[in-house]
């Protein structure tokens, strides 16, 4: 069975990092305690893509931000395709400058789940043996709640920031991002004007025999879309040609399949 699970205490590392930065001590225990129920509630919001319906997730996250008294904005790139963001403003230095902004980004949509292959309801957020199960617990509603709890803790600390910190939840990552980040970049470019750093999915925490390791990812391969066209002499299925457009296309695809592309390691 393919499982999606996240450890109840997974947000601890992020919150401890936030706490260590603050000049005044804050009690992060309430934010740790809120993480599990907030994640369970988020997993119970159906944002399976297609069709997405990410505006449901926007409403859920917006309510949590409202409870904390944090202003936020949202926009639909298409009916039901919601995107949300909130900002903690940085304090300018003596010269009136702030450092490049930091964005905490995750996507609201999740891929479909075949309940027949699950031992729990994929939209239940059921807790079993210290784990929370649900579609999106790892990809990426778990990340979204970790980031949210860190964001809420940072806001509660009232620590002066040397940069803006954004919390951003977007639509459509699982189907190309055209209604999510792609749409925002095209239609709301001002949101990213001062951004210098963006923390997103990719790296993760893994448990090995030797202990827990935090995997850091700095880049990804990107897709290369190709269109192959083959031509040949037409004929009839009852008397096929030795070489046709179809056989040429199949041979071409086989050459692509057998090609070993060199590894290009990009310095971090």
Located regions from the model:
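Sec/Tat signal peptide C-region and signal peptidase I cleavage site
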Residues: 21-25
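Acidic/His- and Gly-rich active-site-bordering loop/insert found
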Residues: 26-135, 154-163
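Short, solvent-exposed loop/turn segments at the edges of secondary structure
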Residues: 81, 120, 162, 193-194, ...
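Flexible glycine/proline-enriched surface loops and loop-helix/loop-strand junctions
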Residues: 210-212, 229-236
């Amino acid at each position: 069975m393919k499982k999606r699970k996240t450890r109840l205490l997974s947000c601890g590392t992020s919150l401890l990092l936030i706490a260590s930065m603050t000049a005044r001590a804050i009690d992060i225990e309430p934010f740790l305690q809120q993480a599990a129920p907030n994640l369970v509630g988020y997993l119970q919001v159906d944002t399976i893509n297609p069709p997405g319906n990410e505006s449901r997730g926007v409403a859920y996250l917006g309510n949590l931000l409202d409870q904390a008294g944090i202003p936020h904005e949202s926009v639909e790139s298409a009916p039901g395709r919601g995107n949300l963001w909130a900002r903690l403003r940085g304090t300018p230095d003596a010269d009136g400058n702030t450092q490049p902004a930091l964005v905490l980004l995750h996507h609201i949509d999740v891929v479909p789940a075949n309940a027949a292959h699950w031992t729990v309801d994929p939209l239940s957020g059921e807790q079993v043996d210290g784990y929370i199960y649900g579609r999106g617990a790892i990809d990426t509603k778990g990340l979204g709640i970790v980031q949210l709890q860190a964001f809420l803790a940072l806001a509660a600390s009232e620590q002066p920031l040397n940069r803006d910190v954004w919390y951003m939840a977007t639509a459509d990552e699982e189907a190309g991002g055209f209604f999510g980040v792609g749409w925002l970049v095209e239609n709301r470019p001002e949101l990213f004007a001062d951004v210098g750093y963006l923390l997103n999915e990719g790296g993760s925490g893994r448990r090995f025999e030797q202990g827990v390791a935090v995997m850091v990812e700095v880049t990804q391969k990107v897709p290369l879309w190709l269109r192959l066209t083959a031509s040949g002499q037409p004929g009839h299925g009852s008397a096929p040609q030795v070489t046709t457009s179809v056989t040429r296309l199949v041979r071409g695809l086989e050459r692509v399949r057998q090609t070993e592309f060199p590894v290009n390691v990009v310095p971090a």
